Amino acid sequence: MAKFLKAGKVAVVVRGRYAGKKVVIVKPHDEGSKSHPFGHALVAGIERYPSKVTKKHGAKKVAKRTKIKPFIKVVNYNHLLPTRYTLDVEAFKSVVSTETFEQPSQREEAKKVVKKAFEERHQAGKNQWFFSKLRF
């Protein structure tokens, strides 16, 4: 079978706490691992999407409304719905790894790096579809 779930592919989580949230695959594990003996992927996604901003909003309001709350997680392939979109993950690829999930402090640091990368891309106006809430 062709490996189409590559790093950088955007997907939608269809099961669990983050169902309906958009994620980007950081590291795919097709064969599984000792701790997760099934095909899975390390993903970084958006838990809370940025709100809409208009011209009449002040600088404080704009700053507050453009905040993004990210999450990082190990997700089974069965719970991912891949899309045609891709996103550059080079900014945080080195930070999010299997070792990141061992200690909460490492996890928080990784989330901060992911948040910074996502907010920079959102401010630049790139990947607009990824930063909009999925309506269903």
UniProtKB/Swiss-Prot annotation:
Which Gene Ontology cellular component terms are annotated?
cytosol; cytosolic large ribosomal subunit; preribosome, large subunit precursor
What Pfam family is a match for this entry?
A: Ribosomal_L27e
Where in or outside the cell it occurs: the entry states: Cytoplasm
GO MF annotation list: structural constituent of ribosome
Please list the GO biological process terms of this entry.
cytoplasmic translation
Its main localization is cytoplasm
Keyword vocabulary terms for this entry: Cytoplasm, Ribonucleoprotein, Ribosomal protein
Q: Does the keyword DNA damage apply?
A: no
What does this protein do, in the record's words?
A: Component of the ribosome, a large ribonucleoprotein complex responsible for the synthesis of proteins in the cell. The small ribosomal subunit (SSU) binds messenger RNAs (mRNAs) and translates the encoded message by selecting cognate aminoacyl-transfer RNA (tRNA) molecules. The large subunit (LSU) contains the ribosomal catalytic site termed the peptidyl transferase center (PTC), which catalyzes the formation of peptide bonds, thereby polymerizing the amino acids delivered by tRNAs into a polypeptide chain.
Subunit info here reads: Component of the large ribosomal subunit (LSU). Mature yeast ribosomes consist of a small (40S) and a large (60S) subunit. The 40S small subunit contains 1 molecule of ribosomal RNA (18S rRNA) and 33 different proteins (encoded by 57 genes). The large 60S subunit contains 3 rRNA molecules (25S, 5.8S and 5S rRNA) and 46 different proteins (encoded by 81 genes).
Give the similarity note: Belongs to the eukaryotic ribosomal protein eL27 family.
Miscellaneous note, as given in the UniProt record, is: Present with 22900 molecules/cell in log phase SD medium.
What is the name of the protein in this document?
Answer: Large ribosomal subunit protein eL27B
Q: Which species?
A: Saccharomyces cerevisiae (strain ATCC 204508 / S288c) (Baker's yeast)
